[in-house]
């Protein structure tokens, strides 16, 4: 495959053009008066959004060098979204400002490596200053404020604050589409996992299509159950207590399932069988969590326990279990609080030691189900386009609120970055190109507040000069045009989001500045690749 190669200024300027085209599309969304961007979908309705990373993902440029530049900036938005869940537009604007100022200095003869070093030192100092400025989230109102700013809607912010208040720091907040109009918050006490009843014959509430069992025994098995003779001794013991039975296992099939269903239909014995969530080692771990939460044991031959010899004291208990076709909720398990606390501590240690983002996410879910709870925000809207846009905003706002709880809050509206730079640069002792690199950061930190001002119809330079002379935490309320105490007014950003945006932008800027050559596909090969992808998708029926 033939390639094109560009060197020096030509290479860097090609990358910069791609970055500018992407950043210019993203930055119009920043601030309370930011605009939306409409994204065309090849299949289905267009999407309307103000989310930086969603816009960035959709941008594909024709020019090969520009495409690479855009991809590098996409990485800034994606990384910030992965780490903090929000702040993608701010990260993109910072990256653009750092690269623009940096390339200007490289063209004037500055050493790119010296500039990169100066940028890294300055960003580290500003990040430290942001951490010092951060105030711990103490009230539900502060969570509501930060979520409201992210979502652009105070009703959404209030609902998210209520959800986090109910489930706690470790809890799970999920967003689901609803057939009804408006917003609804559904709270779950205890543990919920994504597996429902094996057979609809287990349903006890026909209207709601749920199996609701009060004060049941819970049998937790790390294998399939097929032979009724293995299960019969335990069934007889449970029937003598007149309590219902919940079976959570890899699967229940054959005559064992038939026996349970027949007894349920006849009214002889109430039970429900549920498939265990997860696969392999993760399934074992989740079954262990359920056992500890309910005060039972996992019946497994690995630990010398056989189903046919299982006694009642090896079964778990809960106040109530609700099973739908898709999920199971365990309410108020009877586990020992000390054992649950020990399990929570163990999972936290595993999270700290894990190198995999996927493993960390799954461990976090397990932790939330044990230590917190589950809140589901159900979203409804008049049209599918509006529904998707609203759901996306709420998901961003949930991430934003969680980040605020994690590392605290700073003044919003781009003010925290600007004011952190004033203090950070007082103590900076650099010279030559490193000092120039630090100055590039100082100028770039003005970019977010200037863009917010511009999107609000104000002059950015005037706003920056005014904010520089205000007390820490005071700045422009772009929604009203007034200069106020931003934290007191509820115009706040999570420190984690602001810090991540700056650090990721600086990382990519350093790569831009130290690039001396770009190797790219020739246009005809790029078009052929795109055509091949289209043909492959058509052949699959897309």
UniProtKB/Swiss-Prot annotation:
Residues that span the membrane, as ranges: none
Binding of ATP, residues: 29-32, 86-90, 413, 477-479, 493
UniProt-listed Pfam families: Cpn60_TCP1
Subcellular location: Cytoplasm
UniProt-listed InterPro entries: Chaperonin_Cpn60_CS, Cpn60/GroEL, Cpn60/GroEL/TCP-1, GroEL-like_apical_dom_sf, GROEL-like_equatorial_sf, TCP-1-like_intermed_sf
PROSITE patterns xref list: CHAPERONINS_CPN60
Reactions it catalyzes: ATP + H2O + a folded polypeptide = ADP + phosphate + an unfolded polypeptide
EC number, as in UniProt: 5.6.1.7
Function summary: Together with its co-chaperonin GroES, plays an essential role in assisting protein folding. The GroEL-GroES system forms a nano-cage that allows encapsulation of the non-native substrate proteins and provides a physical environment optimized to promote and accelerate protein folding.
Stored PANTHER family: 60 KDA HEAT SHOCK PROTEIN, MITOCHONDRIAL (PTHR45633)
Protein name: Chaperonin GroEL 3
Species of provenance: Frankia alni (strain DSM 45986 / CECT 9034 / ACN14a)
């Amino acid at each position: 495959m033939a390639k094109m190669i560009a060197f020096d200024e030509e290479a860097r300027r090609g990358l910069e053009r791609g970055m500018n085209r992407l950043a210019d599309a993203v930055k119009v969304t920043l601030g309370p008066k930011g605009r939306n961007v409409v994204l065309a979908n090849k299949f289905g309705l267009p999407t309307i959004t103000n989310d930086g990373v969603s816009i960035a993902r959709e941008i594909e440029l024709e020019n090969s060098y520009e495409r690479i530049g855009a991809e590098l900036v996409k990485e800034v938005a994606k990384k910030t979204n992965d780490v903090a869940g929000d702040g993608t537009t701010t990260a993109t604007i910072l990256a653009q400002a750092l690269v623009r100022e940096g390339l200007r200095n490289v063209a004037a003869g500055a050493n790119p490596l010296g500039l990169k070093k100066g940028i890294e030192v300055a960003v580290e100092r500003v990040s430290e200053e942001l951490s010092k400025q951060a105030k711990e989230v103490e009230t539900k109102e502060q969570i509501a404020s930060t979520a409201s700013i992210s979502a652009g809607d105070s009703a959404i912010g209030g609902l998210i604050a209520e959800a986090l208040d109910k489930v706690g720091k470790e809890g799970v907040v999920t967003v689901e589409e609803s057939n009804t109009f408006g917003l609804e918050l559904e709270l779950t006490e205890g543990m919920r996992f994504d597996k429902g009843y094996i057979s609809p014959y287990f349903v006890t509430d026909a209207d709601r299509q749920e199996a609701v069992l009060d004060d049941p025994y819970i049998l937790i098995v790390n294998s399939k159950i097929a032979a009724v003779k293995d299960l019969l001794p335990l069934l007889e013991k449970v029937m003598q207590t007149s309590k219902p039975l919940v079976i959570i296992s890899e699967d229940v099939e054959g005559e064992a399932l038939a026996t349970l269903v027949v007894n349920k239909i006849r009214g002889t014995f109430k039970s429900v069988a549920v498939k265990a969530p997860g696969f392999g080692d993760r399934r074992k771990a989740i079954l262990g969590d359920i056992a500890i939460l309910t005060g039972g044991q996992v019946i497994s031959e690995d630990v010398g326990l056989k189903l046919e010899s299982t006694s009642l004291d090896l079964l778990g208990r809960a106040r109530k279990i609700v099973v739908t076709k898709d999920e199971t909720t365990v309410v108020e398990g009877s586990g020992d609080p000390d054992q649950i606390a020990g399990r929570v501590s163990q999972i936290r240690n595993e999270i700290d030691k894990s190198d995999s983002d996927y493993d960390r996410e799954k461990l976090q879910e397990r932790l939330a189900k044990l230590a917190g709870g589950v809140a589901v925000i159900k979203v409804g809207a008049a049209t599918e386009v509006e529904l998707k846009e609203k759901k996306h905003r709420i998901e961003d706002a949930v991430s934003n609120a969680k980040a605020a709880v994690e590392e605290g809050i700073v003044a919003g509206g781009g003010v925290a970055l600007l004011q952190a730079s004033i203090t950070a640069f007082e103590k900076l002792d650099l010279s030559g190109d490193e000092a120039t690199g630090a100055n590039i950061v100082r100028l770039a930190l003005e970019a977010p507040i200037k863009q917010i001002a511009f999107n609000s119809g104000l002059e950015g330079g005037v706003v920056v000069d005014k904010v520089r002379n205000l007390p820490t935490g005071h700045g422009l309320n772009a929604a009203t045009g007034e200069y106020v105490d931003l934290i007191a007014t509820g115009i706040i950003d999570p420190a984690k989001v602001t810090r991540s945006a700056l650090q990721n932008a600086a990382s990519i800027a350093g790569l831009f500045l130290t690039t001396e050559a770009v190797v790219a596909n020739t246009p005809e090969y790029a078009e052929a690749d795109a055509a091949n992808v289209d043909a492959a998708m058509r052949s699959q029926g897309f």
